C-alpha cells in the first residue's frame, strides 16, 4: 500500500514550522510554543545554546535554538548573518557606520571580520544609488 512519506521529528534546536515561504515561525519559549511573524524579527542574538529574538515592538523571546539553525531557516533575501553571534533582518537596517549596523537610533550590532565582505556586497548591490 502507498503511504505518504514520513518526516523525521525535529531534533533539538530545530523547529517544526520553518519553511522559508511561511510568514510565521513557531518558537518554543517559556514552556509554550508561540508564533512569531518573521517580518517582526529585527535581529537574532546568540547566547550560547540559546537565541534571543529581538522584535519590532521592543520585546525579546529567548529560545533553545542554535543560530546556525535559524540562519538556514529564515529567508536569505531578508536575513543575513553579520557576526558569529548576530543575524539581522536586512529590512530593518537604518544605518551602517564604521563596522556597525544600526537598527534604530541607539541599538546596533557589530559586523564580524568574516562577514564584512558579504555585507558590503549586499550594500553595494542594493544601495549603490544612494
Which role does the model predict for each range below?
Residues 119:
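Basic, Lys/Arg-enriched C-terminal extension of HTH/homeodomain DNA-binding domains
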Residues 1-104, 108-110:
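Conserved binding/recognition cores within well-folded domains
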Residues 122-130:
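Short, charged, intrinsically disordered terminal tails
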